[in-house]
Amino acid sequence: STLVGMELLIEIEKSDDIPCLLKTIKLCGIKVANITINDAPQGASKGHLEVRLSLLVGRNFDASHLLDELAFHMPVVKFEEL
């Protein structure tokens, strides 16, 4: 199956949630090609983090499935496909 690149921007409330975020992504069978963490995103609440992910996903991947999984484990402030 062909993998395609996908860019996601996820805003989370605290850095403690990063291990959970990455674990959940891995459990969904998604490969992370690159991750950038911005600890002072513009327009975000104090202490929030912006995590930009370059992912390799299957062609029929539905990002809303990942959002549902993440939201089950942690507060997701923003979830955006770039």
What residue spans do the PLM features occupy?
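Arginine residue identity/basic-tract feature
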Residues: 23-26, 31, 52, 59, ...
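Conserved short beta-strand edge segments in small beta-sheet-based binding/regulatory domains
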Residues: 31-38, 67, 72-82
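Canonical alpha-helical transmembrane segment with a positive-inside/aromatic-interface signature
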Residues: 1-37, 41
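Short amphipathic alpha-helices in soluble, non-transmembrane regions
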Residues: 20-28, 62-74
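Short, hydrophobic beta-strand segments
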Residues: 8, 47-55
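Helix N-cap motif at beta-to-alpha junctions
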Residues: 14-15, 56-61
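Generic structural motif recognizing short loop/turn segments at the entrances and edges of beta-strands
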Residues: 4-6, 47, 75
